[in-house]
UniProtKB/Swiss-Prot annotation:
ATP binds at A363, V364, T365, G366, S367, G368, K369, T370. The lineage of its organism: Eukaryota, Fungi, Dikarya, Ascomycota, Pezizomycotina. Residues 554-733 form the Helicase C-terminal domain. Residues 350-524 form the Helicase ATP-binding domain. This is ATP-dependent RNA helicase DRS1.
Length: 840
């Protein structure tokens, strides 16, 4: 009996019943989970398995462990003898093995003591909701990860730009050396002079230090509403604003609901208020924005009828992504990025996108529009035929940074699928992009220019198989700057496709949308196109007439005292952003610039430096105003108001994203009145918080004077930078010549790259794009001609306002001066007569 029982024990095989199966990732492993299984904590599972083993099996396991240790001891001794080791060393190995066996026995005894606590929950146990632990949850994901950046490929055509920080560092070092030299010379002169006491210069320096102390803006939130742009609701507000403009030039703003008491008194003879021309224009534009019945009829005929779900359906049915019946790899990708619940635009757009319908979507900035079109695209691509790789989706973006960001978000969401991506962006290597296109990626994310370049010049790129077209920031893509390129793409790709358009300021013009080739699109407008986020505070700093030249002083003051961290400053022109970058560097403020004159490597490095917190300020043009999603942007400053209210909405939308709070400050002068009034009117209609920030003009003048003193140094830096650029270009030309000599035949054998426009048409398109961003005045070149009397008087008046009031001669001074001249002439004649007589 004992022999049979022993044989049965040896033949016994451990099995786990259904009840004993450990709960891993919500259930049994599927084929899709094979790559996740190894990452599970094995120690806890083995511990639970040991607690479920029968006592008879434990005895057999102890016997096996002892025999195993004895065999191990014999093997070690044999190995030691074969290698010619000494006997002592072999015995020592045996003792180690025995000690190990004793230790293992003690561990097993401890495990037997723990068997009584089967029902207790392990203190180290953590619930894994959705398998986020095993798939690597990314917190605060914003599409600018370093891992994805490494996979994007080398920038084969990257140009090494001039390092402005190096120039500023050299100049700072020279200045420090000169100051040290002066101090040493001054110390020597003080040693030579046996003068004791306090010098006048020292006292003067102390006074200057006291004057230069910055005020403390403790009450910066207790702000008064401004008459500038604040009177956007009625005629009484307009009158109050007109009366406020006639007041003193003090920077404090009167109340927008009425004028000062002195101006409002009936006894004073006050002229009838006259509206500002910009206010009249803005009123006309607001009237024109009212819906035209003909346009409404066109819209109703063009768009598909909207389905209005009930509130209960909106709240209950689509509260989570699981309710959209998405595939498991997509849900795992959403969990990895940290998306838990869909936003309003995602709740509306995902079901329509899954049905394959054309749609036009609009929502406020930071509401998740990118995921709203990527999620249905990925879900549809999971059911594609896989025998022949084919490019099926094209996503077009207006800027390179936005395309790179969308590429990173899409690849992260598709981590657990076999969907392939490619980004066609300027600044990256053409050859590497062509090699990727040869593999026929499923999704192509591109800017229009590079997309057309490959479409015309790359033999490996075909657009005949495209099934889905997405235009992100569609209102910008439909403007004149991109009109020609977009028409070229739309005329080439197949007409039978799904088209999706998204933007925060989506246009309602049917004439523009017809160009895209939409087929009864579904219109999904979650928010009004003129609205901002509710968590955004909009602030305005007014510059009085004649103080426009002090604008940089106001900006430096705000960046030094109020907005000191995670700030994006927007400029209209590249040269202004670059000049501000130099001024910030000279004042010791760390900043990065972002505009179109920089190389692609410099642009990405600037965004990364700001994102990682290496620099607190990002000085950018409208290149960064659309779509750029950087976590933690606290404030946005408009150096001057943009050309239109739509551009203003995109600029201020870089902060207060995804439910966070933020502030937007605009430094506004008289030319900016129209945009400011439109922003205030839309904000008040929405119920947003709008305030006017009061800035001490004396302190702003001090900073402006500091900037004026640096003008000569700024010009020297610009000159040095220009010389370094010329040297770099000369080196590049030399390398180009060397390559032509070495590989001339190969280079000449390459087919010439073609474009659908001539150089003249390119220049015209560029002018149209500039006029869209900065207005028609930015394109018109002023001809050199003689100024008329009115123009001279206008220039003189502007100069007098900037310089301030100066003394002028009156009638008495002119008359007295004339008398003195006549007296002087008579005296001179008498002196001449006397001299002649004396000579005779």
């Amino acid at each position: 009996m004992a022999g049979k029982r022993k044989a049965r024990d040896e033949e016994f095989i451990f099995t786990l019943s259904d009840e004993e199966t450990p709960y891993i990732n919500g259930g049994d492993f599927d084929e899709e989970d094979d790559d996740v299984a190894p990452s599970i904590n094995k120690s806890k599972n083995t511990k639970t398995l040991k607690s479920r083993v029968e006592p008879s099996s434990k005895k057999r396991r102890n016997e096996e462990s002892t025999t195993g240790h004895q065999n191990k001891k014999l093997k070690q001794q044999e190995q030691g003898q074969q290698k010619g080791l000494k006997g002592k060393r072999a015995i020592a190995n045996g003792w180690d093995a025995e000690n190990d066996s004793n230790g293992s026995g003690e561990d097993e005894e401890e495990e037997e003591d723990e068997e009584g606590e089967e029902g207790l929950l392990d203190s180290d146990f953590e619930f894994d909701i959705g398998g986020a632990t095993n798939i690597g949850l990314v917190e605060e994901f914003d599409g600018w990860g370093a891992e994805d950046r490494d996979k994007q490929g080398n920038m084969g055509e990257a140009k090494k730009g001039v390092d402005l920080d190096e120039i500023l560092c050299r100049r700072r070092q020279k200045k420090l050396e000169s100051q040290e030299k002066k101090t040493r010379e001054a110390a020597k002169s003080n040693v030579d002079d046996s003068f004791e006491g306090l010098s006048d210069d020292d006292g003067h320096n102390e006074d200057e230090n006291e004057d230069n102390e910055m005020p403390n803006f403790d009450d910066d939130e207790l702000l008064a509403p401004d008459a500038f742009g604040m009177g956007a609701e009625g005629e009484s507000d307009e009158q109050g604003k007109a009366n406020a403009d006639k007041g003193s030039d003090d920077e404090s703003m009167p109340d927008a609901n009425g004028a000062d008491e002195e101006d409002a008194s009936d006894s004073d003879s006050v002229a009838s208020p006259v509206a500002h021309p910009d206010d009249l224009r803005s009123d006309e534009s607001s009237d024109s924005e009212e819906e035209d019945p003909e346009e409404v009829a066109k819209r109703n005929a063009f768009f598909a009828p909207e389905e209005n779900p009930t509130k209960s359906e909106e709240t209950s049915s689509n509260s989570t992504f699981q309710n959209f019946n998405l595939s498991r790899p997509i849900l795992r990708g959403l969990a990895a990025v940290g998306f838990s619940a869909p936003t309003p635009i995602q709740r509306k757009a995902i079901p329509v996108g899954l049905l394959g319908k054309d749609l036009v979507g609009g929502a406020v900035t930071g509401s998740g529009k990118t995921a709203a079109f990527i999620i249905p695209i990925l879900e549809r691509l999971l059911y594609r035929p896989r025998k022949v790789p084919t490019s099926r989706v094209a996503i077009l973006m207006p800027t390179r940074e936005l395309a790179v960001q969308c590429y990173n978000v899409a690849t992260k969401l598709a981590t657990y699928t076999d969907i392939t991506f490619c980004q066609l962006v300027g600044g990256f290597s053409l050859r590497e992009q062509e090699n990727v296109l040869k593999q026929r990626p499923d999704v192509i994310i591109a800017t229009p220019g590079r997309f057309i370049d490959h479409m015309r010049n790359s033999a490996s790129f075909t657009v005949d198989t495209l099934e889905i077209l997405v235009l992100d920031e569609a209102d910008r893509m439909l403007e004149d700057g991109f009109a020609d390129e977009l028409n070229e793409i739309l005329n080439t790709i197949p007409k039978s496709r799904q088209t999706m358009l998204f933007s925060a300021t989506m246009t309602d013009s049917v004439d523009k949308l017809i160009r895209v080739g939409l087929n009864r699109p579904v219109r999904l407008m979650v928010d009004s196109k003129k609205h901002t986020v509710g968590t955004l505070v909009q602030e305005f700093v007014r510059l009085r007439p004649g103080r426009e030249g002090k604008r940089m002083g106001y900006l430096v003051l705000l960046c030094n005292t109020i907005y000191t961290n995670r700030v994006i400053v927007f400029f209209r022109q590249k040269k202004e952003a670059h000049r501000a970058r130099i001024i910030f560097g000279l004042l010791g403020l760390k900043a990065a610039e972002l505009h179109g004159s920089m190389s692609q490597e410099q642009r990405i490095n600037a965004v990364e430096a700001f994102r990682d917190g290496k620099v607190p300020f990002l000085l950018a043009t409208d290149l960064a105003s659309r779509g750029l999603d950087i976590k933690g942007v606290e404030s946005v400053i408009n150096y001057e108001a943009p050309q239109s209210h739509e551009i203003y909405l995109h600029r201020v939308g870089r902060t207060a994203r995804a439910g966070r709070s933020g502030r937007a400050c605009t430094i506004a002068a008289e030319p900016d009145r129209k945009v400011v009034k439109a922003a205030v009117k839309a904000g008040r209609a929405q119920g947003a918080k709008i305030v006017s920030r009061v800035v001490d003009p004396a302190v702003a003048d001090e900073w402006a004077s500091k900037v004026e003193e640096m003008q000569a140094e700024i010009e020297d830096i610009l000159k040095e930078e220009k010389e370094e650029k010329q040297l770099a270009q000369a080196e590049m030309q030399v390398k180009r010549g060397q390559n032509l000599i070495k590989h001339g035949s190969e280079i000449m054998a390459r087919p010439k790259r073609t474009w659908f426009e001539t150089e003249r048409e390119k220049r015209e398109a560029k002018k149209r794009a500039l006029s869209e961003l900065n207005g028609p005045d930015s394109v018109i070149k002023k001809e050199k001609r003689k100024l008329s009397g009115k123009e001279k008087k206008k220039l003189d008046d502007n100069r007098l306002r900037e310089e301030g009031k100066i003394w002028k001669k009156g009638k008495k001074e002119r008359e007295s001066k004339g008398d003195m001249r006549s007296q002087g002439k008579g005296k001179a004649k008498k002196d001449k007569v006397k001299a002649k007589k004396a000579a005779r």
